[in-house]
Amino acid sequence: MTKRYWNIDLEEMMKAGVHFGHGTRKWNPKMAPYISAKRKGIHIINLTRTARFLSEACDLVFDAASRGKQFLIVGTKNKAADLVAWAAIRARCHYVNKKWLGGMLTNWSTTETRLHKFRDLRTEQKTGRLRRLPKRDAAVLKRQLSHLQTYLGGIKYMTGLPDIVIIIDQHEEYTALQECITLGIPTISLIDTNCDPDLADISIPANDDAISSIRLILNKLVFAIREGRSSYIRNP
């Protein structure tokens, strides 16, 4: 994997609060190598380690995107949801930002069936067929469509398992992470000081609660994916 320069600036990360971890009582001892200090009852993340692993993650997604690989971004907590959708749309990735439905990847055949149903209902809505149904039947199908849009809207164009999954908040998305581990899908995960750095293929130590921190990390990854996609388009 070729190393590239991604303009990852320590001062920019400090301004975004990337270095603020959780309280010292809520920590995973495995995170000790990624912590530089304790301050006012919270752990301070070593930003040089953050920069190193973020750079590695950018290299990985660039190379994958330049080979036409598919990405899934997962972040369902309220603070991350809008950022995840925005980042995924910009980078033309799939995303889950409302709720992870158990078995979404490990029981892919069921997910695929739901996606087919979702696409069929969207087609019926666009062509006006729903309006021609009896009111009660139309109401039932509209509720189904709304439910599917909420939970599967970000993966509606996904035709198979993703090649790489990017996870925002390891604790919140533990089920998704476990499904990736089971299937052998490479993962990139934001990890705060209460997480296990050994679970993901690339763990980026960072504040996973602050919107500014999540935005900065996603911005770098999105830029790398977009650059990789441009390379793929130029050299198919």
UniProtKB/Swiss-Prot annotation:
Subcellular localization is given as: Plastid, Chloroplast
| Record-linked CDD domains | RPS2 (cd01425)
Q: Which SUPFAM superfamilies match?
A: Ribosomal protein S2
- The domain of life is Eukaryota
Q: Does the keyword Transport apply?
A: no
Q: Name one GO cellular component term.
A: mitochondrial small ribosomal subunit
InterPro entries in UniProt: Ribosomal_uS2 (IPR001865), Ribosomal_uS2_bac/mit/plastid (IPR005706), Ribosomal_uS2_CS (IPR018130), Ribosomal_uS2_flav_dom_sf (IPR023591)
Alphabetized UniProt keyword annotations? Chloroplast, Plastid, Ribonucleoprotein, Ribosomal protein
Q: Pfam family of this protein, just one?
A: Ribosomal_S2
The processes (GO biological process) annotated in the record are: translation
Gene Ontology MF: a single term: structural constituent of ribosome
**Which ranges of the sequence are coiled-coil?**
none
What protein family is recorded? Belongs to the universal ribosomal protein uS2 family.
Q: Record's HAMAP family?
A: Ribosomal_uS2_B
Q: What is the name attached to this protein's record? A: Small ribosomal subunit protein uS2c
Q: What is the species listed in this Swiss-Prot or TrEMBL entry? A: Daucus carota
